[in-house]
Amino acid sequence: MKEVFLDTETTGLSTKDNHRIVEIACIETEGLIPTKKIFHKQLNPEREVSEDAVKVHGFTNDYLRNKPTFDKIAPDFLKFIEGKKLIIHNAPFDLGFLNYELKLLDIEGIKKNVVVDSLETAKLKFPGQSLSLIHI
């Protein structure tokens, strides 16, 4: 089975505040071995990036201004992940943003049953330890 390790960066922490995705990064694997296929896009979020978010990912409003919007890359993104298991660290965050973006386009969201949350897996394997990606 093919898997996709997926991560996003956003303008802020909550879709309730209309924050948007500014970057999607995906690496495909097969049996957890990299296939050398990637999907990586930086996006114009069509809104301001919060100062706190810039401190996390470094993407400024000026830098993102001429990048494509989510609607332009959505078909290619969905094709890339189709039929694959998604491995996401802190999946509710990334999946929430991805499904928010898809909902804005009247596209059905990504189902939870194709997602493995590596944060939840790490909690079981490394109880009581720091679980940020840099530590595991």
What are these model-derived regions, one by one?
Residues 112-122:
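A short, structured active-site edge motif that brings together acidic residues
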Residues 1-113, 127-133:
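Conserved non-catalytic scaffold segment of RNase H-like nuclease domains
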